[in-house]
């Protein structure tokens, strides 16, 4: 009886070729494809996996789990790798790994295979997560093992009649989920080349966007968006709704050269229309609901959390601790944020909360002012005392300094 390998199957070039490669190595292949909100035709993927030679194919709808257990932390934690990339692909990898391990244990497979190259981040994310969840499982990386170029891989697919939606003229590598879309390879590898129109799918060119704006009010409960214009949505449906609405306005395009975990720089094109709107609105609500010290310290945690996610360390004690901190900060992040969507921009123009720390009577410069300005004299004297003492001792600062 042949040993079984569970393959993370997407229906794309790498994993389609990997099915045949694993069969040639003497394994039975159990394909596993997750829906994390990318809108893929899963019936087609299922049939394609079987046509490629897989003995079984599991199709798992994990969209709700992805939004509730993973994207929720991207929102509450304002996760942005290098202050630019909202960890789109990285965020789905721990969930995919979790499901692969569950299928491997269910089918008595000896290991798990993925279609990642030896140059990317995903190989690290998958393998570290799998070993964290079940150290006994073997991990196979066919693409890394055979060492082919993208062109050689395409040629192999053509020779073996493996249908893939890719060719030498359009060799993009695309990954998409609920939180956004990532695109690389081909002409995009030249960091000076402008991305062609066919590199985008979720967002319109600015020239093709409406000439009138849309204005929406997003309601948040404990850090998460729950309704738009008083219409309630589950989180996954709310994100998909905003992907459509904001994408129509050309919002969410990111052209980024990032520092990969494996030590190289990579040019990536991201489309994150819903994420951009939600994160801007969430940050705006935090400005009136978080205390000054929390608001100033939270970005330190956010940066570390984003790096943990990007670097494949979702299943780790540190990430568990970071989640607890983030959750504790969101207890009062409840309220409404008004956002205007127009010509590539999501602009916050209003925010309110029953837990707002903004006191209009203290902030106003009108006759309603309740701020005790006389108290400023003593505050300034004490606040500036260390500076004054230092200048008395060392002679003060000259104008040249």
UniProtKB/Swiss-Prot annotation:
Q: Where in the cell is it found?
A: Cytoplasm
Quote the record's binding site residues for L-aspartate: 117, 121-122
The reaction(s) annotated as catalysed by this protein in its Swiss-Prot or TrEMBL entry are: L-citrulline + L-aspartate + ATP = 2-(N(omega)-L-arginino)succinate + AMP + diphosphate + H(+)
User: Which CDD domains does the annotation name?
Assistant: ASS (cd01999)
Predominant subcellular localization, coarse grouping: cytoplasm
Keywords from the UniProt entry = Amino-acid biosynthesis, Arginine biosynthesis, ATP-binding, Cytoplasm, Ligase, Nucleotide-binding
InterPro entries attached to this UniProt entry: Arginosuc_syn_C (IPR048268), Arginosuc_syn_N (IPR048267), Arginosuc_synth (IPR001518), Arginosuc_synth_CS (IPR018223), Arginosuc_synth_type_1_subfam (IPR023434), AS_cat/multimer_dom_body (IPR024074), Rossmann-like_a/b/a_fold (IPR014729)
Q: Which cellular component terms (GO) are annotated to the entry?
A: cytoplasm
Binding annotation for ATP: 8-16, 115
Known EC number: 6.3.4.5
Enzyme class, first EC level, given as a word: ligase
Keyword Metal-binding: yes or no?
no
UniProt pathway annotation: Amino-acid biosynthesis; L-arginine biosynthesis; L-arginine from L-ornithine and carbamoyl phosphate: step 2/3
A GO molecular function held by the record: ATP binding
Q: Spell out the subunit comment.
A: Homotetramer.
Q: Which PANTHER family match?
A: ARGININOSUCCINATE SYNTHASE (PTHR11587:SF2)
Question: What family does this belong to?
Answer: Belongs to the argininosuccinate synthase family. Type 1 subfamily.
Q: What is this protein called?
A: Argininosuccinate synthase
The protein's organism comes out as Staphylococcus carnosus (strain TM300)
